[in-house]
């Protein structure tokens, strides 16, 4: 029921809304076009629907100009993303993903900033068999992309405490219960026969035939770690623990990182805490929040369609009142909590029940075999003997989790044999870095990110070392476009691609993920970046207060103005 007080924005529906409306619940003509061998690509309308099945059509942009000269179509390929709530994979599932990446992908796995696997380079005629093998491993790609609830994140290591384990179970339940109900995925990819005559109301009781105006992201944090950047989520839950027992969750709404260059009506935003719910109320809060976005989100202008804009347009208190109206009960007052950081903690740690966990540093989240670093092979060999699990972190790293005391020696030997690392030989800056895929596969990228950030850090490390800052954690993030997949606006140093070799530089985000950055320099190249840091980092080394983080220092020192809300991000 739509509230008469709150108003949905006016305007004609976007072309994507029309595509969804005509799609027969995300079917479109995908089944037919995937059989077509004339082109390696698919029509744009079907590509818009393909997202909801966990995939995007891409092309190798390194080859684009040469193929145009040869009058060939782009080197089309598909990216495939797995739905994996909380980032948990069994060793058997890891081996399946490893095999598929070698057989059908580009011999790499990307560990994403939302705790899941991405595979790149899959050809159209290999898509169905790849998806079928993923499903046979008890994983899937449903709703990993698209205008639905995406992969539900949670604090990375559920086995470090009973609380983490409990929170992980809630993330799985949310992910499963908020899935689209259409059987399109199963019919197109898994050869399920369609059941005729299913009433529309039963097809998508929560989403409806148009699904959501844009993607929707949920994450659960366990203080004092904000590793999932809970304030960046459309809907964030903050676990509240009293006397070692999970009593419920603070509820935060309206976060999101994406924006559009040059359009100040778009901006990153942090969610705001509006109250507290008990664990058994979690799903009800999530479902009702999603239906508010379904009913009031902007379906006319997609760049203003995320839930953060809905909240800012309608007003936080009005959205809270509407949520409580739909719930039929009021949220309790938010409980106190505290975050220390939003990064990972590396190396071996002993958890509950005598189990061990090794958090390893994987630069850019890219699992592959390098010339002198057989990372993919090493992890494959560990997966063959490991009896615990793997945990993909929201900082693109990996936890070899739930290792028994009996297995620890064997796994430690493999870690040493293949040179797998907890990052201690790297600077804390590098260990705190994150980059999206960007070029050559992402169609939105305006500049390099994953391929370039390590090289830039090589040069920044010289400045860091000169100033005694090698062990100082400074979060640094780079994205190839303003969409924010690597949560650039929450990096103490952030870069957003503007053009090849050119970036907007941002400073001043909080180390615990509670404050956005602000643009410091626009459209600058490497020399200008390094020149700025040669000025700022020595000042930080000399003038900082005890325990003061870089993002706080640049504000106190007057180098950058604090961003107090996403609505003044561009000021």
UniProtKB/Swiss-Prot annotation:
Siroheme binds at residue 485. Pfam families: NIR_SIR, NIR_SIR_ferr. NCBIfam families: CysI, PRK13504.1. Binds 1 siroheme per subunit. Component of the sulfite reductase complex that catalyzes the 6-electron reduction of sulfite to sulfide. This is one of several activities required for the biosynthesis of L-cysteine from sulfate. One of its GO terms (molecular function) is metal ion binding. InterPro entries: CysI, NiRdtase/SiRdtase_haem-b_fer, Nit/Sulf_reduc_fer-like_dom_sf, NO2/SO3_Rdtase_4Fe4S_dom, NO2/SO3_Rdtase_4Fe4S_prot, NO2/SO3_Rdtase_4Fe4S_sf, NO2/SO3_Rdtase_FeS/sirohaem_BS, Ubiquitin-like_dom. Belongs to the nitrite and sulfite reductase 4Fe-4S domain family. GO terms for cellular component: sulfite reductase complex (NADPH). Keywords: 4Fe-4S, Amino-acid biosynthesis, Cysteine biosynthesis, Heme, Iron, Iron-sulfur, Metal-binding, NADP, Oxidoreductase. It comes from the Bacteria. This is Sulfite reductase [NADPH] hemoprotein beta-component. The keyword Oxidoreductase applies. It catalyses: hydrogen sulfide + 3 NADP(+) + 3 H2O = sulfite + 3 NADPH + 4 H(+). Its cofactor is siroheme; [4Fe-4S] cluster. PANTHER family: SULFITE REDUCTASE [NADPH] SUBUNIT BETA (PTHR11493:SF47), SULFITE REDUCTASE [NADPH] SUBUNIT BETA-RELATED (PTHR11493). It comes from Bacillus velezensis (strain DSM 23117 / BGSC 10A6 / LMG 26770 / FZB42) (Bacillus amyloliquefaciens subsp. plantarum). Alpha(8)-beta(8). The alpha component is a flavoprotein, the beta component is a hemoprotein. Pathway: Sulfur metabolism; hydrogen sulfide biosynthesis; hydrogen sulfide from sulfite (NADPH route): step 1/1. GO terms for biological process: cysteine biosynthetic process; hydrogen sulfide biosynthetic process; sulfate assimilation. Transmembrane segments: none annotated.
